[in-house]
């Protein structure tokens, strides 16, 4: 008798996607981050749903409703900190997932890669709007500064700003619509994840060698499900440790002060996972130029497949490209550090140098080194 998971209309879709899915036998732990992101998304949707039951999206009561959740709701503090620190875990996994794609040449699956970039933008938008909801000082001023960047767009910038605000400044209308979008976007992200997986299963997974692995495939279950479960345990242990021992480690103390339009914080900055892009934005003195650089810092991922000049797909056997890749990682860490520093000497020049290096490595040095490696292969 045929197994029900292979005949049932719904179960056979799940079976072909997760159970009997053929996968390369050489996948390393770097391939765990896709499933970890799925767990992060599930945690965020669940905790967010319960938080939304108690939150009020009104400027007069938003801050107090978050305080009420932490003090009066059963395990409300746990929900709140799981949600806030879960976002940090989400971005750690997201950046490692993208980094793995860059290192092992997964961007050659262009449809999967492009949907991934859309996902990255959607998750960033969701996180930004979520940061505004507690209505603390950094929430309010972060929203004001970030949305004000749209005014740099010629002709329509100011109108676009006021349209997003729902008035002449960040106020009640802004908070209400941000809450609506923040609640709605994770479900759009979930739909995009399904499209991402659809395209991935059309081509099959890449592997560390970058060589087609059709003759050497194994079932996803039980081999990779066990491996994924180990990843879940490690990540959830790290998240639980962060939430239970140091829940405010990655947050900003200014967000415990209620939003006040009359008092500007000494240093307005976004959450840590946006600091690299914020540093690139600040490194250009011109407002429009800064906004373009900010958008390009993420959108540049879309042209990485075009810039792939190497005869080998993966960087596993390309030591020169590996050196450049880790230099790029160091530059991103530098930009993240600079984004959290005040705008003064020597941070300004360090930020500008790191920003130039970031674009230089991706646009020029990577393709050039790839061509050099191709030449060295002839020796």
Swiss-Prot record:
Membrane topology reported for the UniProt record: Multi-pass membrane protein
The keyword Glycoprotein is annotated on this UniProt entry: no
Family matches, as Pfam families: Cytochrom_B_C, Cytochrome_B
Transmembrane segments: 33-53, 77-98, 113-133, 178-198, 226-246, 288-308, 320-340, 347-367
Subcellular location: Mitochondrion inner membrane
Residues bound to heme b b562: 83, 182
GO biological process per UniProt: mitochondrial electron transport, ubiquinol to cytochrome c
A GO term from the CC aspect: respiratory chain complex III
SUPFAM superfamilies in UniProt: a domain/subunit of cytochrome bc1 complex (Ubiquinol-cytochrome c reductase) (SSF81648), Transmembrane di-heme cytochromes (SSF81342)
Necessary cofactors: heme b
InterPro entries noted in UniProt: Cyt_b/b6_C, Cyt_b/b6_C_sf, Cyt_b/b6_N, Cytb/b6-like_sf, Cytochrome_b, Cytochrome_b_C_euk/bac, Cytochrome_b_N_euk/bac, Di-haem_cyt_TM
Residues that coordinate or bind a ubiquinone: 201
UniProt KW Transmembrane keyword: yes
Cofactor-binding details, from the entry: Binds 2 heme b groups non-covalently.
One example GO MF annotation: metal ion binding
Keywords: Electron transport, Heme, Iron, Membrane, Metal-binding, Mitochondrion, Mitochondrion inner membrane, Respiratory chain, Transmembrane, Transmembrane helix, Transport, Ubiquinone
Positions of heme b b566 binding: 97, 196
Additional notes on this entry: Heme 1 (or BL or b562) is low-potential and absorbs at about 562 nm, and heme 2 (or BH or b566) is high-potential and absorbs at about 566 nm.
Function: Component of the ubiquinol-cytochrome c reductase complex (complex III or cytochrome b-c1 complex) that is part of the mitochondrial respiratory chain. The b-c1 complex mediates electron transfer from ubiquinol to cytochrome c. Contributes to the generation of a proton gradient across the mitochondrial membrane that is then used for ATP synthesis.
PANTHER family in UniProt: CYTOCHROME B
Entry's family note: Belongs to the cytochrome b family.
Subunit annotation: The cytochrome bc1 complex contains 11 subunits: 3 respiratory subunits (MT-CYB, CYC1 and UQCRFS1), 2 core proteins (UQCRC1 and UQCRC2) and 6 low-molecular weight proteins (UQCRH/QCR6, UQCRB/QCR7, UQCRQ/QCR8, UQCR10/QCR9, UQCR11/QCR10 and a cleavage product of UQCRFS1). This cytochrome bc1 complex then forms a dimer.
Protein's UniProt name: Cytochrome b
């Amino acid at each position: 008798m045929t197994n029900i998971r292979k005949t049932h209309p719904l179960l056979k879709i799940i079976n072909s996607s997760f159970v009997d899915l053929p996968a390369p036998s050489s996948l390393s732990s770097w391939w765990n981050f896709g499933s970890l992101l799925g767990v992060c998304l599930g945690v965020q949707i669940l905790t967010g749903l319960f938080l939304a039951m108690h939150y009020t999206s009104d400027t007069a009561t938003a801050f107090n409703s978050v305080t009420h959740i932490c003090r009066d709701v059963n395990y409300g503090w746990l929900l709140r900190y799981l949600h806030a620190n879960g976002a940090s875990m989400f971005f750690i996994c997201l950046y490692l997932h993208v980094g793995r794609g860059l290192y092992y040449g997964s961007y050659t699956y262009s449809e999967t890669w492009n949907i991934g970039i859309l996902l990255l933008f959607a998750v960033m938008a969701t996180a930004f709007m979520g940061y505004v909801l507690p209505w603390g000082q950094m929430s309010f001023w972060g929203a004001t500064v970030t949305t004000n960047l749209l005014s740099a767009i010629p002709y329509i910038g100011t109108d676009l700003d006021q349209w997003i605000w729902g008035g002449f400044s960040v106020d009640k209308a802004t908070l209400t619509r941000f809450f609506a979008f923040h609640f709605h976007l994770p479900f759009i992200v979930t739909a995009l994840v399904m499209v991402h997986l659809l395209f991935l299963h059309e081509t099959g997974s890449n592997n560390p060698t970058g060589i087609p692995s059709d003759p050497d495939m194994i079932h996803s279950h039980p081999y990779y499900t066990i491996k994924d479960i180990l990843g879940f345990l490690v990540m959830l242990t790290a998240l639980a440790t962060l939430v239970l021992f140091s829940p405010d480690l990655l947050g900003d103390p200014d967000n415990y002060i209620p939003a006040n339009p009359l008092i500007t914080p000494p240093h307005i900055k976004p959450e840590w996972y946006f600091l690299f892009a914020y540093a690139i934005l600040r490194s250009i003195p011109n407002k429009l130029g800064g906004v373009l650089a900010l958008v390009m810092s993420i959108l540049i991922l879309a042209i990485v497949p075009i810039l792939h000049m190497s005869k080998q797909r993966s960087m596993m056997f390309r030591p020169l490209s590996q050196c450049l890749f880790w230099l790029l990682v160091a530059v991103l860490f530098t930009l993240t550090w600079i984004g959290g520093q005040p705008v003064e000497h020597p941070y300004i020049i360090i930020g500008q140098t790191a920003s130039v290096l970031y674009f230089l490595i991706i646009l020029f040095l990577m393709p050039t080194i790839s061509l050099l490696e191709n030449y060295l292969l002839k020796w």
